[in-house]
Each structure stands twice: as structure tokens, then as C-alpha cells.
């Protein structure tokens, strides 16, 4: 109980820190193996919003140290343009995690992804090490939630530190832990994390789709994820990037409607009208807020 109280106290004290999370679009975030130099080089030309250079699942045990050095050198070399670059380290509970973090924290990456997050104190420890290593104060932490304990502690995890800016669903590991095989069986878990992420205004990304040849099924899952409230999706193959970017971006019709709703509302305010309608539907302030969010997202996407 004492440890939990101290952890939550640290979270709330850090919440006042002047950290501003990135507003970069994260429709498509592609995992790339950190042991594959050719793949990481290819990532510089892919239309993904972000890349996760992976030191964890995608790297064999006998390649861990080599991959760590390769990723560090690759990120320091740069050349990724406006793409966000995140490095997924091994868990700090493994023999490689802390060495990963201490080497890449100051590499210039945009974020560090921490796997199998189950408690706020794991995030606090990463933050502490990043500070010790001279990481850029703007470098974010992205937390992967992929276990039952992580799901049930989602509120604590999402509420911990402004720097902990993005939540990623680890659906493959979660399916294994729950011994389930269908997307439907994960619905409660997904929605619990989405609720917690939205409560604290965090970006939340859906997990990967494993059948890379089933593009129809992939698009269906993207559409479903957007409907749930996910901001984007993590990917394992470049062939799925274009679909993801299209699904998680506002459509032309959505942009047009958003622009018109904002205009109608402001015109009504100027003319002293109390009731505003658009296409026969009542427009309230909440609709204007939603429309402004769509326009902001559209403008950010147009810049990349």
C-alpha cells in the first residue's frame, strides 16, 4: 500500500511538469526489426506516420546486443524525415532492457516504447533512467499494455506522467495470456484501455493484424478500431500502410462537413441565432468541438 501511495504521489506531482505531448498523426505505426539494417533503411521511404524500431520480439536472443548498437547508430544517423521514430526496448525485467534504454535514450528518437507495462512504477523507472542519460525532455514514453494485469491497471498506467503519451495494445500477447483466438474475445479489454487513455487524453493505438495477405480483413479491423476510438494502428508489413492511413484520416466528406458546421455555428452566433442546424440536424457546441478536432487532424496530415 505504501509503495502504491508513493507511486501515485509521484505521478500526480509529475503531472504538473511542463511536458507537452506531440500532436503528430499516428494513423500508421510500423514495427521494424532492429537487427535488419536493410529494413530500417527502407523505412526512410515508407509512407507510415511512425516507425517502431524493435529490440524486443523481432530480435533473436543472440542478436540483442548487435541490434541495440545498430538501432542506436541508425537513429543518430537520421534521414527519416517527418516520420516519428520510436525504439521498443526489452522489458527492464530482462537482461537487456536497461542496457537498451541507457544506450538509446539520448539517440534522438521521438519515443521509447516499453513492453508489458503492468504498473505505473515501471514507467516512472524508465523516466528516471531517461533523465539520468540526458534524454531530450521531449522524448516520449509509449506504453504497451498486453497482459490481464496491465488491462486492469489501465487507469493507473494512463494517468502516470504526461511523458507517457501513447498507449499501444499488445493484442497478440494478450490473446495468448487470455487463451483466446478471436477479436471479439478481446473487446472488453480493448474498451477498458481506450476509456482510460481517453480519460487522460492519451493517444491509443490498436494492435497488429497478423494475416498480412488478408487486406480485406485488415481493412475491416481498421474500420472497427476507428469506430472503437483508436487513433491509429500498429503494423507489421508495409503493404498495410496505405489502407491504415486512409481509414484513420478524416474522409473528404468529413472534412467538408466539419468546415461547414464550424462556419454555420459562427454565422449563427454573429447573427444572434440561438438554434443552428446543418443538413437538418441540430448543431450544438459539442459538434463544433468535434468538427474543429477533425479539421486539426486534417491539417496535421496535410503537412506530412
Where are these regions (language model features)?
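Expand to "…catalyze enediolate/carbanion chemistry for C-C bond making/breaking, isomerization
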Residues: 1-304
Amino acid at each position: 500500500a505504501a509503495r502504491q501511495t508513493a507511486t501515485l504521489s509521484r505521478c500526480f506531482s509529475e503531472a504538473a511538469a511542463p511536458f507537452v505531448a506531440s500532436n503528430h498523426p499516428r494513423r500508421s505505426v510500423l514495427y521494424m526489426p532492429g537487427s535488419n539494417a536493410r529494413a530500417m533503411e527502407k523505412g526512410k521511404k515508407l509512407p507510415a506516420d511512425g516507425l517502431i524500431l524493435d529490440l524486443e520480439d523481432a530480435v533473436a536472443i543472440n542478436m540483442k546486443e548487435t541490434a541495440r548498437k545498430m538501432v542506436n547508430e541508425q537513429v543518430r544517423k537520421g534521414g527519416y524525415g517527418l516520420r516519428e521514430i520510436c525504439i521498443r526496448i526489452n522489458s527492464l525485467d530482462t537482461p537487456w532492457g536497461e542496457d537498451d534504454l541507457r544506450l538509446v535514450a539520448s539517440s534522438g528518437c521521438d519515443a521509447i516504447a516499453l513492453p508489458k507495462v503492468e504498473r505505473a512504477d515501471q514507467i516512472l523507472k524508465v523516466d528516471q533512467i531517461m533523465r539520468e542519460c540526458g534524454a531530450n525532455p521531449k522524448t516520449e514514453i509509449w506504453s504497451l499494455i498486453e497482459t490481464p494485469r496491465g488491462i486492469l491497471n489501465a487507469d493507473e498506467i494512463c494517468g502516470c506522467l504526461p511523458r507517457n503519451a501513447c498507449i499501444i495494445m499488445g493484442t497478440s500477447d494478450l490473446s495468448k495470456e487470455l487463451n483466446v483466438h478471436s477479436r471479439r474475445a478481446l473487446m472488453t479489454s480493448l474498451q477498458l484501455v481506450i476509456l482510460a487513455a481517453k480519460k487522460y487524453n492519451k493517444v491509443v493505438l490498436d494492435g497488429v493484424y497478423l494475416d498480412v495477405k488478408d487486406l480485406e480483413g485488415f481493412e475491416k479491423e481498421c474500420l472497427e478500431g476507428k469506430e472503437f476510438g483508436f487513433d491509429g494502428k500498429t503494423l507489421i508489413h508495409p503493404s498495410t500502410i496505405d489502407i491504415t492511413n486512409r481509414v484513420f484520416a478524416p474522409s473528404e466528406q468529413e472534412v467538408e462537413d466539419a468546415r461547414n458546421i464550424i462556419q454555420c455555428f459562427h454565422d449563427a452566433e454573429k447573427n444572434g441565432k440561438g438554434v443552428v442546424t446543418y443538413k437538418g440536424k441540430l448543431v450544438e457546441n459539442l459538434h463544433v468541438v468535434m468538427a474543429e478536432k477533425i479539421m486539426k487532424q486534417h491539417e496535421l496530415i496535410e503537412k506530412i
